[in-house]
From Swiss-Prot:
Location of the protein in the cell: Periplasm
Alphabetic keyword roster: Cell cycle, Cell division, Periplasm, Signal
NCBIfam families for the chain: propeller_TolB
Top-rank lineage group of the source organism: Bacteria
Gene: tolB
Family: Belongs to the TolB family.
Gene Ontology annotations of biological process type: cell division; protein import
PANTHER family: PROTEIN TOLB, PROTEIN TOLB HOMOLOG
Protein name: Tol-Pal system protein TolB
Major location category of this protein: periplasm
Amino acid sequence: MRNFLYCTGVLLLLWMSTSSQAALNIEIFGGGTNKIPIAIAPFNGERGLPQSISAIVSADLERTGLFKLVDTLGLTSQEPEQIRYIDWQGRGASALVVGSISPLPDGRIDVRFRLLDVVKQTQLTGFSGAVTTEQLRAFAHRIADIVYETLTGEPGAFSTRIAFVRKQGSQYALQVSDYDGFNARSLIEYTEPIISPAWSPDGSRIAYTSFEKKKPVVYVQTLATRERKAVANFKGSNSAPAWSPDGSKLAVVLTLHGGSQIYLINADGSGLQRISQSPGIDTEPSFSPDGRWLMFTSDRGGSPQIYRMPVSGGVAERMTFEGDYNVSPHYSPDGKRFVYIHRNAGRFNVAIQDLSTRQMQLLTDSNFDESPSFSPNNRMILYTTEIGGRGILSTVSSDGQAKSRLSQEAGNIREAVWGPLLKQR
């Protein structure tokens, strides 16, 4: 199954070694029609800063596939009363973002922005704040969130975080970063594999599987304190944790009674309860947002396919029928769809299926994708794809129209998962 090894209920990837420091470069490609034409004018005063706020906002919005960026060459940010709306109308913009950056006496930076309706020539919203240089990127994501929500009526997901595993040389590191891969920091590092990270619903903890004890054990780690606890260390293999929507329970995969089966435990590791009963391998559980269903991968029918069963157990319903290899299901936050990996003509691609129509759509056309998960606003999907023998972070819009690649100069990135929406302070 091309580099995948079905082992103790886990799809364990055999990683290749890499070394040296990593740098990030964003590449966005693809796109469709019926997008909102928006111009993001260069912010006054941002030249010379280590990061361009207008460039970050532009990349955020373009990555969703819902916006068409209008050329701003030769035009700059101005105060609303000075703006020549006819110039922006001539370039096809229906919305315009302008802003300014200026230094403050205490060393911080004052950032201001406005979102304008080019057609009606009115201001839709505005925002300002004083930040440090290190906070510029987060503030730019906040601006993009405000623009996105104002124009679409949906919350933006640009201020969220992701988790992933990075292998460099013989070292495995569980890392957390901004949603676009920047500002990564390591939670733990070991010379043994770390796999299947899963965010708690409130974003305060991450469950994951570590092989540091020479066998797979499930841990839960608190991000703020870095304290962790082994919550599934039963006889045999313990793997593939998934949080219930209320954060009180975890679904895990154990070989406690022989084959790999799905169990429920409380978030502290107590209250073990067996859920699946099959002669095959059941693995990779995912809770439905309402907490009623578990979707999972099983080879009970002879090939890896995706099934769904009540969280209390019972009869499993097969969900995928196209092809002989469908794995790694992940529910959308609204519960209407699920995303997974589908083998297509020897390629492993991200696919999405509508639960009401059962229609499947391929979203990617690369060779080897894995670990898809939705953004918390349903609009984007995070996954890793293999290029040149190493995994890199990528996103695709949920309609498949816009793809974004975060290229790492070094390091092998796998097991990516998107975190929940965070409350704005």
